[in-house]
């Protein structure tokens, strides 16, 4: 038998008349669909679902799952994504029946345990971030950004400063920052980085004005560099009447070392699915809690979960609230995982997490500095950016090297981001990887650098060992084939 590396689609396995279920004859009189629904809601043709037996169905998806790659499969140094190992105790707690089988519409008295988790997590995150109040409602990072910006907008309006319609973002910022600003009705204004990869203070003074609503920053920033002038940045923006927003994407570098609230930030979002080991990838679920200083607390989404004596309950009496931003109260399963992680680690453990994340990143950076261009030479925090400009001289681009890494069983780092580094490759090893894993990755990167110089075709034609060879990504982006019918049309 010839074994193919690729798998047929579930539609290609379909055979008319096969099915994967067996139901008894109904003994209840039922009406026809036609007698219930208007004709316009009834299909004219049979839905083209695949027809397969249960065994074929199970084998198909088992085969696909075995071809997936995740943190449990191998090293995943995807910069700015904090692809750390997710402890399995988190899953055990999330599956406790009292939590897993609860419903958001149950009466408060029936879900006191769940509400206590929500309240306790709010309190933990307040302490970690240095904020005065926290809402868990937002479903992800960008959702948290938007929520905080809507709070800023309401605050400025209430203070008679609705003209403040500009949000400052660094040229190294996450793409979600300007996107969230735009979505919230603001104009994004770029501030340049200096030669050290930090916010250029003089340029910041130039762009700040009476229309400044806020500045959005990560610290450490997207280049993995700590903004050592953060207190001066705070003073400049606050004096202009603006607010400071902390993008929590890089919090993994500073836990129990320094808090956003102590740096002068007025609001912060966190990624529970990154820093606090909620599983992520595949589109979710995520969680992007938002913390604020007391001046902004009355604008938080409602309801909040509060403690009244020995009882936990929803509080809808938030006078200036921007309203609900998520049905029910967000993604509760992620709260359970994050709370389990925080309680398991404790303050000392979270500090060690950040120390190990920073150590691992600097170890890789120092090991690769003689083989790749390092645009910013100072110590990094949890991640760093290198450049493939040396390899480009031999006709090999960062994309090619990322493809070659697949042959080593390593997920490629983030590439071509941030945009202000030529042929950039952003590497974030996280704290959970061993020295042996780091050394394996370093050796692979050094080998690829040598191949780019001495045997470039080997890199240009990579990957060689994956199930699917190099894709035509340009055509895939411009002419995507998203329906099975289209596949037939393409073949014809």
From Swiss-Prot:
<dbReference type="InterPro" id="IPR015424">
    <property type="entry name" value="PyrdxlP-dep_Trfase"/>
</dbReference>
<comment type="similarity">
    <text>Belongs to the GcvP family. C-terminal subunit subfamily.</text>
</comment>
<comment type="function">
    <text>The glycine cleavage system catalyzes the degradation of glycine. The P protein binds the alpha-amino group of glycine through its pyridoxal phosphate cofactor; CO(2) is released and the remaining methylamine moiety is then transferred to the lipoamide cofactor of the H protein.</text>
</comment>
<dbReference type="Pfam" id="PF21478">
    <property type="entry name" value="GcvP2_C"/>
</dbReference>
<dbReference type="InterPro" id="IPR049316">
    <property type="entry name" value="GDC-P_C"/>
</dbReference>
<comment type="subunit">
    <text>The glycine cleavage system is composed of four proteins: P, T, L and H. In this organism, the P 'protein' is a heterodimer of two subunits.</text>
</comment>
<dbReference type="InterPro" id="IPR015422">
    <property type="entry name" value="PyrdxlP-dep_Trfase_small"/>
</dbReference>
<dbReference type="GO" id="GO:0005829">
    <property type="term" value="C:cytosol"/>
</dbReference>
<dbReference type="Pfam" id="PF00266">
    <property type="entry name" value="Aminotran_5"/>
</dbReference>
<feature type="modified residue" description="N6-(pyridoxal phosphate)lysine">
    <location>
        <position position="274"/>
    </location>
</feature>
<dbReference type="InterPro" id="IPR023012">
    <property type="entry name" value="GcvPB"/>
</dbReference>
<dbReference type="InterPro" id="IPR020581">
    <property type="entry name" value="GDC_P"/>
</dbReference>
<keyword id="KW-0663">Pyridoxal phosphate</keyword>
<dbReference type="GO" id="GO:0019464">
    <property type="term" value="P:glycine decarboxylation via glycine cleavage system"/>
</dbReference>
<keyword id="KW-0560">Oxidoreductase</keyword>
<dbReference type="GO" id="GO:0004375">
    <property type="term" value="F:glycine dehydrogenase (decarboxylating) activity"/>
</dbReference>
<dbReference type="InterPro" id="IPR000192">
    <property type="entry name" value="Aminotrans_V_dom"/>
</dbReference>
<dbReference type="GO" id="GO:0016594">
    <property type="term" value="F:glycine binding"/>
</dbReference>
<protein>
    <recommendedName>
        <fullName>Probable glycine dehydrogenase (decarboxylating) subunit 2</fullName>
        <ecNumber>1.4.4.2</ecNumber>
    </recommendedName>
</protein>
<dbReference type="GO" id="GO:0005960">
    <property type="term" value="C:glycine cleavage complex"/>
</dbReference>
<dbReference type="GO" id="GO:0030170">
    <property type="term" value="F:pyridoxal phosphate binding"/>
</dbReference>
<dbReference type="InterPro" id="IPR015421">
    <property type="entry name" value="PyrdxlP-dep_Trfase_major"/>
</dbReference>
């Amino acid at each position: 038998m010839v074994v193919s590396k690729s798998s047929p689609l579930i539609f290609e396995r379909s055979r008319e008349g096969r099915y994967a279920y067996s139901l008894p004859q109904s003994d209840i009189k039922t009406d026809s669909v036609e007698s219930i629904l208007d004709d316009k809601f009834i299909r004219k043709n049979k839905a083209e679902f695949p027809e397969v037996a249960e065994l074929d169905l199970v084998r198909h998806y088992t085969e696909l799952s075995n071809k997936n790659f995740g943190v449990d499969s191998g090293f995943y140094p995807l910069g700015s994504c904090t692809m750390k190992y997710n402890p399995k105790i988190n899953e055990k707690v999330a599956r406790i029946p009292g939590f897993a089988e609860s419903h958001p519409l149950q009466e408060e008295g029936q879900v006191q345990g769940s509400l206590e988790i929500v309240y306790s997590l709010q309190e933990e995150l307040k302490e970690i971030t240095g904020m005065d109040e926290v809402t868990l409602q937002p479903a992800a990072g960008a959702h948290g950004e938007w929520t905080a910006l809507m709070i800023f907008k309401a605050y400025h309006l209430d203070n008679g400063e609705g003209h403040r319609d500009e949000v400052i973002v660094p040229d190294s910022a996450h793409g979600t920052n300007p996107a969230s600003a735009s979505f919230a009705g603001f104009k994004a204004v770029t501030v340049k980085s200096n030669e050290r990869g930090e916010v250029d203070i003089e340029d910041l003074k130039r762009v700040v004005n009476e229309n400044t609503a806020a500045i959005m920053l990560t610290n450490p920033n997207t280049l993995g560099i700590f903004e050592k002038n953060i207190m001066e940045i705070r003073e400049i923006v606050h004096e202009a009447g603006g607010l400071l927003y902390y993008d929590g994407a890089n919090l993994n570098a500073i836990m129990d070392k320094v808090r956003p609230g102590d740096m002068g930030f007025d609001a912060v979002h966190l990624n529970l699915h990154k820093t606090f080991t909620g599983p992520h990838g595949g589109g979710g679920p995520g969680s992007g809690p938002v913390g604020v200083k007391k001046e902004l607390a009355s604008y938080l989404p409602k309801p909040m979960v509060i403690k009244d004596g020995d009882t936990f309950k929803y509080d809808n009496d938030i006078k200036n609230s921007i309203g609900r931003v998520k049905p029910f109260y967000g993604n509760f399963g992620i709260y359970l995982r994050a709370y389990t992680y925080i309680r398991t680690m404790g303050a000392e453990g979270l500090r060690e997490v950040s120390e190990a994340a920073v150590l691992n990143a600097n170890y890789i950076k120092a090991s690769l500095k003689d083989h790749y261009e390092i645009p910013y030479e100072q110590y990094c925090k949890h991640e760093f950016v290198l450049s493939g400009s040396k390899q480009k001289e031999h006709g090999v681009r960062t994309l090619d090297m990322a493809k070659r890494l697949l042959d080593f069983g390593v997920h490629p780092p983030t590439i071509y981001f941030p945009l202000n580094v030529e042929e950039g490759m952003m590497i974030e090893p996280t704290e959970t990887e061993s020295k042996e894993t780091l050394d394996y990755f370093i050796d692979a990167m050094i080998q690829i650098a040598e191949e780019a110089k001495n045997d470039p075709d080997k890199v240009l034609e990579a990957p060689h060992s994956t199930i699917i060879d190099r894709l035509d990504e340009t055509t895939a982006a411009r002419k995507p084939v998203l329906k099975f019918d289209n596949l037939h049309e393409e073949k014809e």
